[in-house]
Every structure is written in C-alpha cells, then in structure tokens.
UniProtKB/Swiss-Prot annotation:
A zinc finger (RING-type) spans 546-587. CDD domains: RING-H2_RNF12 (cd16674). It comes from Mus musculus. E3 ubiquitin-protein ligase that acts as a negative coregulator for LIM homeodomain transcription factors by mediating the ubiquitination and subsequent degradation of LIM cofactors LDB1 and LDB2 and by mediating the recruitment the SIN3a/histone deacetylase corepressor complex. Ubiquitination and degradation of LIM cofactors LDB1 and LDB2 allows DNA-bound LIM homeodomain transcription factors to interact with other protein partners such as RLIM. Plays a role in telomere length-mediated growth suppression by mediating the ubiquitination and degradation of TERF1. GO terms for biological process: negative regulation of transcription by RNA polymerase II; protein ubiquitination; random inactivation of X chromosome; ubiquitin-dependent protein catabolic process. Pathway: Protein modification; protein ubiquitination. Interacts (via N-terminus) with TERF1. Interacts (via C-terminus) with ESR1. Interacts with LIM/homeobox factors such as LHX3. Interacts with LDB1, LDB2 and SIN3A. Interacts with LIMK1. InterPro entries: RING_finger_E3_ligase (IPR051834), Znf_RING (IPR001841), Znf_RING/FYVE/PHD (IPR013083). The keyword Transcription regulation applies. This is E3 ubiquitin-protein ligase RLIM. GO terms for molecular function: ubiquitin protein ligase activity; ubiquitin-protein transferase activity; zinc ion binding. The modification N-acetylmethionine is found at residue 1.
Length: 600
C-alpha cells in the first residue's frame, strides 16, 4: 500500500516536472521570437537596462510589458504605495507590522528597483498560486569606482529605502493560499525579515534542463527543489538579472554584486489547518543537502498533537564575483570555462542548537567560489487572534538566527581565504559562533538568552535583545548602516553592532574584492559592443549553430560578427562580451588592449 502511494507521488512529481520543462521550452521559443522582432533601438534599450533576462524565464507578454514600461518611464507611485512606505517607517510594534502586511499581501507580484549614489538595487517577489511557492530575490550593486564619491549621508537613505521596498515586495506575495490572513501574514513577515537580513546574497543551485539547446538553464540556483513556475529573471542585478522582473538601472562596471533568494513553500495539511494560528510556512529543501524540508523539524521539538512543527528554510548563498563581470546566474562564460575545469570540490558541515539547524558548504567551479548557509528555523503555532508574547519572542529568535547565520557565513568566507578550508577547523568555528550567538529555544519559546549579534568575530560585541519593540524597530527599518567599505586584502569579519538593525550595505563588503582582483580582465563596454558588426539571418546561415546557446540560427535572427569572423546570436554574444574580451571559440581578443583601455 505504501509502495503504491509512493509510486503515485513519484509519478505526479515526474509529470509536474515534465510540464514545467515544456512550459519553459515554450517560453524560450517565445523569447527568441521576441528578440528577433525587436528593432535595434529597442534591443539596445532592453539590453542596456537588463530587461531581457534569461531565455525561458519570462513570457513574451512580460517582455513586452517591460519594453513598454521602460519606454514610458517609471510609473508614478500610487497613494497606496506611498502610504505603505510611510507606514513602514513608523512600524515599531508587532501589531502594526501584521496590520501592514495584511494590507499589502494581496497587492500582486511586485518589482522594486532604485539607485542612489553608488548603490543600485532591485527586488522582486513572485508567488505561484498553484503550488504556493514563494520566491523573493534581492540584489544590490555597489560601484567601487564611485565609492569614494558617495557620502555616508547619501548612502543611509538608500539603505532605508531598500528595506522598505524589500519588505513591501516580499510581503505582498507572501501567502496567497494561506488559510487565514494572520496565518499568511506571519510567514510573510518572517520572509520579509529574512530577506532584509540577507540583502546581498547571490543565488543559484544546479538545475539542469532536459535538453541542451539553451545553456541558460544550466546554472546553479538557490532555489529549493520543487515544482516551480518560472519567475522573472533573477541573477546579478542590474547586470545579473534573470529572476527579477526587471525594470531599470544599468549596472556600472567594476561593481560587486550579490544576491539572495528565499524560497518558502506552504505545506498546510488538514490537521494543521485546525491549529488556527499556524505559521503556514515550510521551507523547501536545499538541493545541495538533499534533505527534504519535511525532515527539517527538530526532533527535540514537538507540538501538543505530536505533529511536526512547521519550519522555515533559508538558503543564503554567496558568490565571489570579480568587478566588471556580467554574470547571468552562472553566466555563459562560467559555464563555457567549466567544460575544461575539474568537477566541484565541496566542503560541508552542519551544526544544530536548540532546534535551529545550520548547514554550511563551500564549493568551487570554473574559478567561481560559492558559499552556502542553510538555516532551518522551527516556528511554533500561535493563535490567530493577534501576536502574543510568545510570538514576539519567536520572531526575535528567528531574526537572531538569521543574523547569526550571516555571521557564520562571513566567518566561513574570510577564514577560507584562498586556501582549502579544513572541515574540522570550520566545525570549531561554527561551534564558537554558536556559543557566542546564542541558542534559540525550539520554536522561539525562550530566547532571552540568545544574543542577536551575528558576527563570529571574537572582538565583536554581543547584541542583546532588550525588547521586542527594539527588534521590530530594527527589522522594520531594515538597517541604517553606512555605505559598504573596502578594508583591503586582510579584512576582518563583518560585525553587526548596530542596535537591532540589519545592516544591508555592511554585508556588501563581503563581496568587495581584493586589490589584486583589479588586474583581472573586464568585459567590453556597451559602446564597444555596439561598434561590432551586426547583420540579419541569411540563407547561408541555415543549419549553422550559435556556439553560446547551442541553438541553430533561424529566420529573423540577428547575428553579431567578431573581428575573428566568428558569429553568434546578438543577445548571446553581447552578454558574453559584457564579461569577457575574447571570442568564445578561438579566444582571440576582440579589441586590442590599447583600444580597450582607452574606453574602459
């Protein structure tokens, strides 16, 4: 009987995966058709504003909407959005936060972007109404070249604005299928807080498509395994943007980018619905761990009815990206280079305290190093009559654990340096961080002993949670730290000493690169790319294949010809040349070094 049930479940999953693949292939065909029909002016407009994204991620209607939106200019902010933004600044207690989340959670799929000084950001929240899957993506770009020109006073408002938009976008799509408003708003709040804590963490975990026609799918994703509906492009933003529903902002070269994806899946069973105030959120699993979210509930924690407590799983991923590189997720260049590289080498270790389980791993492929911190957070059931004291403590504990995870992640990155880390050393580091950052009680019942400092640095001062209002105030404001800074080659781990705040731009310094990275070659500028020859598909091009996307040229395709005579789809080679200065096939320089330096 059990075998038949498991077989049925497996067949359903396979069917869902096949449908998802077919849907993506249809969208990919629509993408190429859309690009083929664009005028050269419209193509440049969308390319320069990073609105094309990745083939298969967006529908043709969505791409057309982006084009129309960028032509018309950014829409004026509605009174409701203004009120939401104003209210978010004033939110300092749990009740008002829940009320605010309830008021915006059904607004719809949203995209937010902005720029101030040397920082630009974009955030997108999307929900699949069929599966209940929720994705939130947030990316920040810091232009190091202009870093010294931007004052701290300029950067702080940008940080605050980012947190407000972040909360709004993540909360709006949080729980459309939730059993009750309060049940849905609370996970939304948890999601929002997690997203705020994470600002810049890149994503990508390996999901391979069934056929090799377009390599855009073969990129790592920080998405949990599940049946998915394609989201808007989210990759590095504004340059790496395939799951973001992008709207604008060119990314300056020499920027450091990071990305964060939070994947939340509602799993509300019949008995759970009876427990009215359930945090209806159960994170899907991290593919790198291969552990289902249904197994993530702490064994030490049990509900009154003996059911597994719900959990939230956060996959925080960091990729070290050199300045000037235009990486669409894993990026075309990275995938091409990886063909001749050794397979992944991964170091992983776990720790668990008080029901909060963390898994850390580091992998390297094609010269790109990826750090992953997975946090599984158990959440207790609460009454849907409003926030109780227990709930406030639970949310405080959750925030604390998120910040702790960031501290551990940063320590892992910095202690790793450029050498192979020792698993035993890493484990000791985690244990030390765990002891410093507190042990959140299961479900957040008793968290007063937890320290909210997320820095594992021995010199960092622990941050005590003196009151729930302080923590809420910090989470609402998102973080008012100054602009990210470069401490040079030997930087200490980041310390979170702001009282109750989640410092967005302090996290950015994780990814500001060492001085020797400045010598790495950069891609071509848009002007240099536009100066290369471009032509339309001809009869002689039939049966020829673009070496970047592994797709045959078809009627209407636009091709770009490099000085070495090799040709590619214009949108494929333009993306490649944004991060490389050589031909993908023969590796000859597209421009002489003198010409490159004169423009770059």
């Amino acid at each position: 009987m059990e075998n038949s049930d498991s077989n049925d479940k497996g067949s359903d999953q396979s069917a869902a995966q096949r449908r998802s693949q077919m849907d993506r292939l249809d969208r990919e065909e629509a993408f190429y058709q859309f690009v083929n029909n664009l005028s050269e002016e419209d193509y440049r407009l969308m390319r320069d504003n990073n609105l094309l994204g990745t083939p298969g991620e967006s529908t043709e209607e969505e791409l057309l909407r982006r084009l129309q939106q960028i032509k018309e200019g950014p829409p004026p902010q509605s009174p409701d959005e203004n009120r939401a933004g104003e209210s978010s600044d004033d939110v300092t207690n749990s009740d008002s936060i829940i009320d605010w989340l309830n008021s915006v959670r059904q607004t719809g799929n949203t995209t937010r972007s902005g720029q101030r000084g040397n920082q630009s950001w974009r955030a997108v929240s999307r929900t699949n109404p069929n599966s209940g899957d929720f994705r939130f993506s947030l990316e920040i770009n810091v232009n190091r070249n202009n870093g010294s020109q931007t004052s701290e006073n300029e950067s702080e408002p940008s940080t605050r604005r980012l947190s407000v938009e972040n909360m709004e976008s993540s909360s709006q799509r949080q729980m459309e299928n939730s059993a009750s408003e309060s049940a849905s708003a609370r996970p939304s709040r948890a999601e929002r807080n997690s997203a705020e804590a994470v600002t810049e963490v890149p994503t990508t975990r390996a999901q391979r498509r069934a056929r090799s026609r377009s390599p855009e799918h073969r990129r790592t994703r920080a998405r949990a395994e599940r049946s998915r509906s394609p989201l808007q492009p989210t990759s590095e933003i504004p340059r790496r943007a395939p799951t973001l529903e992008q709207s604008s902002e060119n990314e300056p070269e020499g920027s450091s980018r990071t990305r964060h994806h939070v994947t939340l899946r509602q799993q509300i069973s019949g008995p759970e619905l009876l427990g009215r105030g359930l945090f209806a959120a159960s994170g899907s699993r991290n593919p790198s761990q291969g552990t289902s979210s249904s197994d993530t509930g702490s064994n030490s924690e049990s509900s009154g009815s003996g059911q597994r407590p719900p959990t939230i799983v956060l996959d925080l991923q960091v990729r070290r990206v050199r300045p000037g590189e235009y990486r669409q997720r894993d990026s075309i260049a990275s995938r091409t280079r990886s063909r001749s590289q050794a397979p992944n080498n991964t170091v992983t270790y776990e720790s668990e305290r008080g029901g909060f389980r963390r898994t850390f791993s580091r992998s390297e492929r094609a010269g790109v190093r990826t750090y992953v911190s997975t946090i599984r957070i158990p959440i207790r059931r609460i009454l849907n009559t409003g926030l109780s004291e227990t709930t406030s403590v639970a949310i405080q504990t959750m925030l604390r654990q998120i910040m702790t995870g960031f501290g551990e992640l940063s320590y892992f990155m910095y202690s790793d340096s450029d050498s192979e880390p020792s698993a035993s050393v890493s484990s000791r580091n985690v244990e030390r961080v765990e002891s410093r950052n507190g042990r959140g009680s299961s479900g957040g019942g008793n968290s007063s002993g937890s320290s909210s400092s997320s820095s594992p640095s021995p010199s960092s001062s622990g941050e005590s949670s003196e009151s729930s209002s302080e923590m809420f105030e910090g989470s609402s404001e998102g973080g008012s730290s100054g602009p990210s800074r470069r401490d040079g080659r030997h930087r200490a781990p980041v310390t979170f000493d702001e009282s109750g705040s989640l410092p967005f731009l302090s996290l950015a310094q994780f990814f500001l690169l060492n001085e020797d990275d400045e010598d790495q070659p950069r891609g071509l500028t848009k002007e240099q790319i536009d100066n290369l020859a471009m032509r339309s598909f001809g009869e002689n091009d039939a049966l020829k294949t673009c070496s970047v996307c592994i797709t045959e040229y078809t009627e209407g395709n636009k091709l770009r010809k490099l000085p070495c005579s090799h040709e590619y789809h214009v949108h494929c080679i333009d993306r490649w040349l944004s991060e490389n200065s050589t031909c993908p096939i023969c590796r000859r320089a597209v421009l002489s070094s003198g010409n490159r330096e004169s423009v770059v």
